[in-house]
């Protein structure tokens, strides 16, 4: 579940909170807020379990992952699969407290979560699939709040997908050399020596979508100020990954948490006060 390393929970939680506060104009229903926060913890934990299950043979070949519980034999893979099902069932019970549209979206989200760890075997875009899986929480937040998915929600969806590709590519850059040896695919391998350039282009697109979100949701100057901070953070991330060191790549990945947090603060200041 990796609750001792909650960065994955944070990175999934921020877009979910963006969507909840935008959909509710700053005042989300407390019940929905609790449902989605707990749902994020459960689904991210389930995602970690199914990822480690799918990669249990691959992880043995990678220094950073060879001591994970399933790979090392500390936890039997069948027990892990049963635990994954339990987590999914608990998350589904939470979704049952919403509406039918959100339940349907949750089913798609589960399928994407299961698909993601296997995509690295046959496509260079597992990061994009992860982005789709994470962004489903955005659509679910809008549907649970409004019982529909307005066109404006798709801007938040797109921003989440692109942001996920950005930070997960940084994460994949740390494993690139070992992934090449064992035949695992990723956007980091596809981008190769152009990785910083392409990440930079994606960062610009991400920022442009965030500006569009400001327009369609009529956000105030508080949000615009936070976008300046987001821009500075992305410049800093470019500085980090230029060092071509695994530590720097992972630092850049972890530091993206602040981007999610800053955007959330900007949204709250714009619509909730």
Swiss-Prot record:
It is found in: Cell inner membrane. InterPro entries: HB_polyprenyltransferase-like, Prenyltransferase, UbiA_prenyltransferase, UbiA_prenylTrfase_CS, UbiA_sf. It catalyses: all-trans-octaprenyl diphosphate + 4-hydroxybenzoate = 4-hydroxy-3-(all-trans-octaprenyl)benzoate + diphosphate. Its EC number is 2.5.1.39. Pfam families: UbiA (PF01040). Its main location: membrane. It comes from the Bacteria. One of its GO terms (molecular function) is 4-hydroxybenzoate polyprenyltransferase activity. Keywords: Cell inner membrane, Cell membrane, Magnesium, Membrane, Transferase, Transmembrane, Transmembrane helix, Ubiquinone biosynthesis. The chain crosses the membrane at residues 7-27, 30-50, 83-103, 122-142, 146-166, 197-217, 221-241, 253-273. GO terms for biological process: ubiquinone biosynthetic process. Pathway: Cofactor biosynthesis; ubiquinone biosynthesis. It is a multi-pass membrane protein. Its cofactor is Mg(2+). GO terms for cellular component: plasma membrane. Catalyzes the prenylation of para-hydroxybenzoate (PHB) with an all-trans polyprenyl group. Mediates the second step in the final reaction sequence of ubiquinone-8 (UQ-8) biosynthesis, which is the condensation of the polyisoprenoid side chain with PHB, generating the first membrane-bound Q intermediate 3-octaprenyl-4-hydroxybenzoate. PANTHER family: 4-HYDROXYBENZOATE POLYPRENYLTRANSFERASE, MITOCHONDRIAL, PRENYLTRANSFERASES. Belongs to the UbiA prenyltransferase family. HAMAP family: UbiA. This is 4-hydroxybenzoate octaprenyltransferase.
């Amino acid at each position: 579940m990796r609750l001792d390393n909650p960065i994955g929970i944070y990175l999934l939680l921020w877009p979910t909170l963006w969507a909840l506060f935008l959909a509710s104009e700053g005042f989300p229903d407390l019940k929905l807020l609790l449902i989605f926060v707990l749902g994020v913890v459960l689904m991210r934990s389930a995602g970690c379990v199914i990822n480690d299950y799918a990669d249990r043979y691959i992880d043995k070949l990678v220094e950073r992952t060879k001591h994970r519980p399933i790979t090392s034999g500390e936890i039997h893979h069948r027990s892990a699969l049963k635990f994954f099902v339990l987590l999914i069932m608990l998350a589904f019970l939470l979704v049952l407290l919403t509406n039918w549209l959100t339940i349907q979206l949750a089913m798609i989200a589960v399928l994407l979560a299961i698909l993601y760890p296997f995509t690295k075997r046959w496509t260079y875009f597992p990061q994009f699939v992860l982005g789709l899986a994470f962004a489903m929480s955005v659509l679910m937040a809008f549907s649970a709040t409004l019982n529909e998915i307005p066109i404006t929600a798709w801007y938040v969806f797109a921003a989440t997908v692109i942001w996920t590709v950005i930070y997960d590519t940084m994460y994949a850059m740390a494993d690139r050399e070992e992934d090449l040896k064992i035949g695992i695919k990723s956007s980091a391998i596809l981008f190769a020596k152009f990785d910083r350039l392409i990440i930079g282009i994606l960062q610009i697109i991400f920022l442009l979508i965030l500006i569009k979100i400001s327009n369609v949701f009529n956000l105030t100057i508080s949000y615009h100020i936070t976008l300046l901070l987001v821009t500075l953070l992305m410049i800093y991330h470019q500085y980090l990954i230029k060092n071509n060191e695994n530590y720097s790549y992972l630092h850049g990945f972890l530091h993206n948490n602040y981007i999610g947090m800053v955007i959330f603060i900007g949204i709250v200041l714009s619509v909730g006060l």
